[in-house]
A protein has these predicted regions:
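Alpha-helix initiation and N-capping motif
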Residues: 28-31, 133, 162
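Mixed-charge (acidic/basic) macromolecular-recognition segments
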Residues: 35-152
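Acidic, proline/glycine-rich low-complexity IDRs
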Residues: 1-4, 137-177
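Residues in flexible loops and secondary-structure boundaries
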Residues: 30-32, 58, 168
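N-terminal ordered "arm"
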Residues: 1-45
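Generic ordered-secondary-structure signal
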Residues: 14-16, 27, 98, 123, ...
Length: 177
């Protein structure tokens, strides 16, 4: 399991301002030990902040302030198991969710949504070397995904607007780069 981030924890209920730094995700025992070190037993009394992301730093602006330290640990545990392709999918899914929230004026992304996105990365198609609408359009045409274009003579392919085809396909599938 790879490490996702460094997190600083301190008890907001204790007069002792000493905190503890942990590398997440952590085990249940590491969490219990940290709670002992900051002199608290209640997760509601724990103030925490991410000091440094080792990966998934694009999540930082989307972390819900009401997320408990246990929810955050669970999220980082899910994230730590993702491979490079799945991490790319997670980034794309997050972009799509952010765009949906903006369109629908839904406010910030919730902890539950982040957990759902992380668990759905295997249901995404990640295309290597496709970084633009034009690349996507070429991919669709060259791989026969646009059956309406199969009847065209080879000489007509040079006249196609691949960027427009790619944009149409990306938008119809709610995709992201």
């Amino acid at each position: 399991m790879r490490k996702v981030c460094e997190v600083y924890l301190v008890s907001s209920a204790s007069s002792d301002e000493r905190g503890v730094e942990l590398t997440f995700p952590v085990s249940q025992y590491e969490m219990m030990d940290a709670f002992e070190q900051i002199h608290t037993k209640s997760p509601g009394d724990v103030y925490w902040q991410v000091d440094e992301f080792y990966c998934f730093d694009y999540l930082a602006p989307h972390l819900d302030e009401s997320m408990s330290i246990f929810e955050f640990n669970s999220l980082t545990e899910q994230l730590s198991k993702l491979d490079e392709r799945q991490e790319t999918a997670m980034n794309g899914l997050l972009q799509m969710q952010v765009n949906k929230h903006i369109r629908e004026n839904n406010g910030p992304i919730t902890t539950q949504e982040l957990m759902m996105l992380a668990s759905n990365v295997d249901h995404c198609q990640v295309l290597a070397d496709v970084h633009s609408n034009e690349d996507l359009g070429k991919f669709y045409v060259e791989n026969g995904f646009r059956e309406d274009l199969d009847a065209l003579p080879d000489s007509a392919y040079a006249l196609l607007d691949y960027a427009k085809i790619g944009k149409q396909m990306r938008e119809s599938e709610a995709g992201a780069f």
